[in-house]
UniProtKB/Swiss-Prot annotation:
The keyword Phosphoprotein does not apply. Keywords: Arginine metabolism. GO terms for biological process: arginine metabolic process. This is Protein RocB. It holds the Pfam family Peptidase_M20. The keyword Membrane does not apply. Induction: By arginine. Involved in arginine degradative pathway. GO terms for molecular function: hydrolase activity. InterPro entries: Peptidase_M20, Peptidase_M20A, Uncharacterised_RocB.
Amino acid sequence: MQYTKISHMNPAERVEALTASLVSLSSVNGTVGEGTKADFIKEVITSYPYFQENPSHVWEQAIPNDPYKRKNIFAFIKGHGESRNTVIYHAHLDTVGIEDFGPLKDIAFDCEKLAEYFSRYEFDQDVQRDAKSGEWMFGRGSVDMQSGIAVHLANLLHFSENLETLPGNVLFMANPDEESQHSGILASISELNRLKKEKQLHYLAAINTDFITPLYDGDQTRYIYTGAAGKLLPCFYIYGREVHVGDTLAGIDPNFISSEITSRLHNNIHLAEKVEGELVLPPSCLYQRDNKESYNVQTAVSTSLYFNCFIYERTAKEMMDLLIEVTEEACRETEQKLSDYYEEYVKRANLPKKHLSWGIQVYSLEQYLEKLRNRGIDPEQCIEQTFKANEHLELRMRCFQAIEELQKLDPDQGAKVILFYAPPYLPHNYLKEDSARDQLLQHVIKEAADKTAESTGETFVFKKFFPYLADGSFLSLHETDGEIDSFIRNFPGWNMIGTIPFKDIRKLNIPSINMGVYGKDGHKWTERVYKPYTFHVLPLLIQQTTVHLLQSYRMTITAKEPKGEG
């Protein structure tokens, strides 16, 4: 879409037109469409008069070794004066797939046809009502988050045409692969550091427009999130004692152990962090299966299990300690049950007892590797060889395979559970009460929100953590070097598959703010964005915030960068 097509429009019309155009182009994660979408975004920006005059202010960055040739798109606007203060706008350009649209796949990216379809859709009154109102735009990516890109593109145009109102700089970036491995934002870290060094930029904050949604029925609040929740993927390799089903009472079934662990962890709200006023989620099971590939009458040898764990204020080490404790409880109860079942069995069958051990050992990966080293085994070599020999496996299965190979080398073939971390890992970050920079940022954003609320009638509420996964997690780091080292020691093959540049992120230390587009049903076929707020109010809120930030900050106020030990 060229500048000439939107130059005559008012600001809200520009955002709507850009959103519809962006939605119409498929950019499903893990497809070449992500590269096509990046090219389109670059084409839009380069058509703006400012960038026609400053073509070097728009550029792309290829994602290293990417099979889909994806890229980041950057655009830089230098405001009036010589300020180095800079606000970052960022958004992800990929979407989830369209399989959920079923027979409507052909119109998954057609906003008008979907609105027409849902206006006749009688199976969900809320969806039908929204479609009939004309205030909602439907389509894959409409809310997550093509409209978010459109808001940034419209604000780029606004500031490029009103440089006198911009007392600093704006740096825009559109990133691919947020819905999977976050390779876009991770690649951008080096570029952000390059710009920081070469242009002597002082990054004040990064504003993400990832979608916000009602937290309960009738919720009209617009939430502003001043930090990002993190994510861990704790994995459990469970090794049992295989037996024929005719001797089942003598075995230790890894599925039994797995079930005991899952029953204690899955959706257990009592294990969730307690952060006042925040939407905090408990662990949830994402994968649970044994190693059997076909039918036979043997019990399983091993089971693989992993969970999604959001982290808010906890560290990876604290989470590992908690999971070890829960797993040990599960194993002790399993041992007792198996022993009781066997005792009752031999009593009923009037059989002599065998001398069986019901012990189940529990290790963190760090503990298990140390045990193997003490027995003269080189675990690092085994892990490296396994990763190289299994590059066809997806990352999590490669990790499980490495643990299985380690178990084969272990002279102790008793039942055991080995806990480790696998990708993806997203750091958490938030504004700290003891940081002058963070408190100033909180104050400035609140001023901008209050001003916008006064002129629009909207109600804004601040939250500490964006409750879902977002690229903003990778822009600053709260963990100390010691805590990061503890995480890496429990992550098999980090030196081969670990992609997070911790030191470079620490150099940036950019606060992440989410001022999102507003909508419903993200990742569902009924996904839709609310036009009155997203197209009319949100661009103004971000403009106000940008100007307030650039006016309020001075170079004498510097970020308290973590030193790595604490």
